[in-house]
Structure formats: C-alpha cells, structure tokens
Amino acid sequence: VVDGPFAVINADDYYGVNAYKMIYDYLSSGEDNEKYRYAMVGYMLSNTLTENGYVSRGICDTDENQCLTGITERTHIEKTKDGAAFTEDDGKTWVPVALDTTVSMNLFGFTASMLKELESRFSAFLTENLEKNPMKCEYFLPAVVGDLIGEGKAEVKVLKSADRWYGVTY
C-alpha cells in the first residue's frame, strides 16, 4: 500500500543519478495543497536520441514557472545533420525540433492522490476503450496527468536534468 510520495519509472530505462535525486528532493519538500503537487524529470532531446534510427518522445510544453502545460507524443523523431526532426507521414515531410527541447521519458513523482485519481478514472477508461480495440487498449499515465492539468487539479513541476538518458533494451 502506497500512502506517501512515490516515483514512477520505465523499468527498462536508465535515467541517471541526478534525476532520482531531483525527484526525491522535490517529493520530500512538500505536500499537495489546493492542487495536486507532482513532478516530472525532463531531458534535453539531444540527450535522448539514438544513432540507431528513430525514437518516440513526449515533447513538453511548460509555463513561465516551469510547470507542465502539455505533452505531445511524437512517434518518429530522428537525428539529422542539422539537429533533429519528426515526421507524421512516413517521411514525406519533416518538422525540425530543437536539440534543447525538453522531452518526457516517463520519470514522474506523485503524491498518493495520483493513485486515487487513477482508480477513479479506470472504469470509465475501460468502458470507453476496451470494446474498440481490446488488444491495444492501454491506460497511458501521461494522458491521466494531462487530464488532471487540464481540469486544474494538478500542477506538474518540470525538473530539468542534464543527464543522458539510456534505453536499456533496443
């Protein structure tokens, strides 16, 4: 049973020592107030790219206080001679992305309130999605985070890491 702050990571990723310290320090420094108080470690896109093809990354938008306002998933980002670019039409057109763009690699820090939110939304998610495509029905954590931000219930501080991120599996 989780009754305090906790971090969520992808099991097959290496985030760097500094990322864990930042999440720990943030979660240790306060509690929920009028909004849920969450955090996400953000990385520079350049520190998450591979030489082996393309990657999927969540491009982060933040406000003046470095709080997350949205994540846009880009499923095909590649290194280019000028930096990086993404495509949404199988390479017919490419849109440049700055190498210092902040991306999410799914390292989040939450208070116990997140578990209540996930549980309260899960039944509606299944009702809405399971019938459409049961083999691909996936409850995406960043989607719930985005919903909570949009509803004004949560504030997600983006903690910027200079560490290099590594995917352990390929």
Roles of regions detected by a PLM:
Residues V1:
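Active-site-proximal specificity loops/subdomain of glycosyltransferases
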Residues F6-A7:
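Short aromatic/hydrophobic "clamp" motif used to bind/position activated sugar donors
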Residues A11-Y14:
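The conserved acidic donor/metal-binding loop of glycosyltransferases
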Residues V17-F108, A112:
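Conserved core of the sugar-phosphate nucleotidyltransferase
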Residues T101-T102, K157-D163:
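Catalytic beta-strand/loop signature of glycosyltransferases that borders the donor
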Residues G109, V156-L159, G167:
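Conserved active-site beta-strand element of glycosyltransferases/polysaccharide synthases
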Residues E119-A154:
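A C-terminal functional module that forms or caps the active site or interfaces directly
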Residues Y170:
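Glycine-rich, charge-dense phosphate/pyrophosphate-binding loop(s)
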